[in-house]
C-alpha cells in the first residue's frame, strides 16, 4: 500500500499495547508510521554492509552473499555507571585482547559505535552478528560480560587482606 503511494525504502511503525484487566488479552494498535530511517536502520545497514547480504523477501531471513543466514542483536544504549571513565582507547584494547571485534572471515562478531559517550556517560552502542539468533545473543552477552569484568571494582575478596596479627 505504501509503495503504491510512492513510499520507498524503510519505514517504522510505532505501536501501543494495552492489556484488558478483565480478559488479560492485549490490544495492539498501530499509532504512527514513520517514513524515515528509524532506530533499527543503523544495525541493519551494518549487517548488510559487513556481509554484503540481502533480505530474502520470501522468508524474511537475512542472507549473506554466501546465502548463510545472519542475525543480529543491537543496542544504542548499553549503559552502566561502571563504564564511566573507560576511554575509547581502553575499549579498543579490550576488544583486541578478547577478540570481540567483527571477523570478516566468519562474518560474525561485534561492531561498536557511540564510543564518544563511553567515558563521560558510561554508554556505548554495539551490533553483534551471528549465524543464528542464539549465536548473536551469545556474542552480545560475552561482550557485556567482558566489559563488566574489565570495569568491575575489586571486591573485598580480591582486595589485599590486612595482617590479622598486631604489629
Segments from the language model and where they lie:
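ATP-dependent carboxylate activation and anion-phosphoryl transfer catalytic cores
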Residues: 1-167
Amino acid at each position: 500500500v505504501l509503495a503504491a503511494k510512492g513510499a520507498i525504502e524503510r519505514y517504522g511503525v510505532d505501536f501501543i499495547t494495552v492489556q484488558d484487566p478483565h480478559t488479560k488479552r492485549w490490544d495492539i494498535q498501530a499509532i504512527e508510521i514513520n517514513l524515515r530511517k528509524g532506530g533499527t536502520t543503523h544495525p541493519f545497514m551494518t549487517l548488510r554492509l559487513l556481509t554484503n547480504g540481502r533480505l530474502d523477501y520470501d522468508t524474511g531471513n537475512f542472507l549473506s552473499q554466501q546465502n548463510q543466514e545472519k542475525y543480529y542483536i543491537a543496542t544504542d544504549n548499553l549503559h552502566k555507571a561502571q563504564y564511566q571513565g573507560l576511554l575509547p582507547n581502553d575499549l579498543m584494547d579490550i576488544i583486541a585482547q578478547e577478540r570481540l571485534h567483527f571477523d570478516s572471515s566468519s562474518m560474525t562478531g561485534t561492531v561498536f559505535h557511540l564510543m564518544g559517550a563511553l567515558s563521560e556517560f558510561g554508554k556505548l552502542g554495539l551490533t553483534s552478528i551471528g549465524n543464528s539468533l542464539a549465536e548473536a545473543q551469545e556474542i552480545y552477552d560475552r561482550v557485556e560480560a567482558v566489559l563488566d569484568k574489565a570495569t568491575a571494582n575489586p571486591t573485598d575478596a580480591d582486595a589485599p587482606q590486612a595482617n590479622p596479627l598486631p604489629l
